[in-house]
Amino acid sequence: MNVILTHHAGVERIDRIANCLALFGMNEFILEIKESSRLFRLTDTGILFVFDETGSVLITGYMATPEKVASMYKRAGYAQVPRNTWSVITRNSRTYRMKF
């Protein structure tokens, strides 16, 4: 996947994105929702990437919060967050919330 980084992602937030990838890794996107002109893509390891509406420009990336993930699943039409995903998100939040 070829992605262009915005100045924000490539300069201002690159350390945060790199730390998330180093701590959590990244296997695959498990959920994608569109909000206004942005695509929010959640990975199975709990990283949330924000892209432009085409999905080719990365705006930012960060550790997903339980609140954001619950909101995303609700917007996608799910009654609740899948158990495995919720476990990952809440564990990350408890363990790493002060690091980011």
List each language-model region with its residue ranges.
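Ribonuclease/tRNase effector modules and their secretory precursors
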Residues: M1-F100
